[in-house]
Amino acid sequence: MLTEGMYIDHVIYGVLDVDAAAERLRRDYGLGSVPGGIHLGGTTNRIVPLAPPTFLELLGVGDPTLGDGVWLAEALAGRDRLLWWVLGVDDLDETARRRGLPTQVGMMDMADGSQRTFRTAGMPRYPLPFFISFDIDPGARMRIWQARYRDAGHDCGPGAFSFLEVGDTPELLDAWLGDHGLPVRHVPGAASGIHAVGIETARGELVIC
């Protein structure tokens, strides 16, 4: 497969308490965050803006009676943990077509009262990464993200993701992504999915696991 313009759009850090996790990341790493919103499937989040438009998503249970809220509570099993990684692509429809995947529409009620929509492909293949496209002009998204970065008030000057550690074999991941060129490190013998992530900062690389 071609590279398809893949980049790490965001990493999902599943947490028991979104606000408490945000405070801990501020205290331990100097990472600020901004309010996110409520996904219609029953999860809620805060956003840690990194080099625009990438981010670390703090994802918690918003409504434990809805499907995604139930799934997240089960996946966390009583502890905060890295949960998933998400890739942006040039053309979501083409990426989905090449893999025989349907696309799905997601919606989110934002803290500012607005509503955002996005499309995904590949979410049922968890914990392999899924693909995402936001229904917003790329230039407008970049401006929003630059403002969020300022509003977060980071103490460490975070930049881009420097690496991801995953338990999936190179063969499995290459079959899923193709020639991706992403900064992925494989951990032999580890369970499938993401285990650690590196973030470039003005203080040096920080690692969350």
Walk through the language-model features, giving the residues of each.
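Glycine/small-residue-rich interface belts in oligomeric ring/scaffold proteins
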Residues: 16-76
